[in-house]
Amino acid sequence: MTKNILLRLFISVLLGFNVTLTISAQDENHGHSAAALQLIKGQRQWFDTHNAAGMVYDQTPNYSLLQFNYDQKNGNFHRVYTAEKQQQANVYTEGNLNLGKVLAWGEFRFTHENERDARFNASLNDPYRGQPFFVVDSGQPSKWRHQNYHLRFRVATPIVFQHLTFGIQATYKAQLAAKQRDPRVDARFYQLQLQPGLTYALTAHDVIGASLNYVSQKEQSDMSLENMQRRLHYYELYGLGTAHKGIGIGRQTNYYGNRWGTALQYEHHTDRWKILGELFADKLVENVDISFTTPRKDAQIAERNLGFKVANSIYSKAYIHQINASFNYKSTNGITYLSQRDNTASSAGWIELHHDIRSTYKTTDATLNYVLTRLRDSEYSWQGAIGIDYQGLDDTYLLPVSVKKSKNAMLFADYRNNFIVGKTMNQRLLLDVQLMMKRAFSGKYAYRGANNDLITVREMEPLDEAFLTADAQGARLSLTYSQLLRQQTNINGYVKLAFSELHSKAKTFNSRRNVSVTLGVNF
């Protein structure tokens, strides 16, 4: 009950914040087309860092938006825990406001999602969040229902004492999920993130910044059976297919952890050039306990991230050139515990006997893209982009040695054209065409344990590796029509239709399709 009240309070606060944005924005601008709003967001270099104190250097104008979206995905070209059919409806609101003495930005998203034909996962809300210790079932297709709440805001000062700015970003997430087939699961994930920061202007053209990152997160997973006459098998995962097989009602699992990190930023800017770089590092320790009444420590992950981002923009009267690059290396140690039951009256519970690192997980992510924008007044006439996203996975179970590796790249080319349909009502038609190509350079899965007959080894992990090492190609097409709702106002309404398909020639897969419809207004 308390959590529901807090969520409603967060929603009310943010909606009230956006109403304020609306009133202020109507007095200051002539409204934003869909392309104009994309252009505004695409120029926010500090927004993509961990430091909210840099908001003043982005010089983002006031805006506010509210949109409703329906999204549907289907097809068998997906990773092993992803559902074959997904239906998602969400409401999203966002706004930016400069009050003079403070700069503020905020967003809220509520998502309801139904999944059909999801396999294996029987424990976590999101099995891809980097936690390898969870429970799976025998792979029978199941339905899932998700409700996700996401609230984030940034506040910052303008430049004070001639050189300094201060800011903070806060994020709250609540994700609820329920599996609809035995063994059932009720999974609840909560996360609170705080990121305070500051910047210091060295000269009129150079700025340095520093920020801290703290995250507290918790997930509770409670398994159950509705049909007690049928006892089903489940599997407790310990890495790369290694699992303990169980039968019956399942287990209660408690995940809780904290992340600490820091980031440094440097910006150099002139009238025609702006470059911003960020170096960041953090560490997450997350514990895995079984049972809520008499908890037994089962496992722990120790995750480290190290990365950087560089955003470079060159401006002229007619064009903007942007080159963006990022790199992140994540290294995770999977630690398992050996415990003994202590049933003495004075200290009933579990005694830890031993723990050690049994598995390691290494992920390398890198991106590089170039964007060319042809300006037209406060929006763009057209925009082109090319880029590549690379990911390398290198996972190892130490004894007996098992490995899972892959190297992938996704290449894309994107073109957007913003057609003027009418000037009186600011009518625009935005066409967006994107071509995609996924290429797998290498990969393998090799299990060398003693339980080759487990379904986690025979089917689950090989199926996931097959996706990671499959080539694919696809395209995405979207149309966005926008116009003023009333001539004397600054409120632009828009409707967006999007379709994409990714097709693979691999024997195991076929394709994945995505259809999306969005209705919204912005100010």
PLM segments and residue spans:
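Outer-membrane beta-barrel "beta-signal"
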Residues: 29-31, 204, 511-523
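Outer-envelope beta-barrel architecture signal
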Residues: 60-64, 100-106, 162-166, 204-208, ...
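Residues that define the transmembrane beta-barrel architecture of outer-membrane proteins
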Residues: 85-91, 145-151, 188-192, 256-262, ...
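Residues on the lipid-exposed face of transmembrane beta-strands in outer-membrane beta-barrel proteins
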Residues: 91-97, 151-157, 194-200, 262-268, ...
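Short, flexible helix-coil linker/hinge segments at the edges of structured domains or between repeats
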Residues: 120-136, 180, 214-256, 285-300, ...
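Long, internal scaffold/assembly segments composed of regular secondary structure
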Residues: 242-386
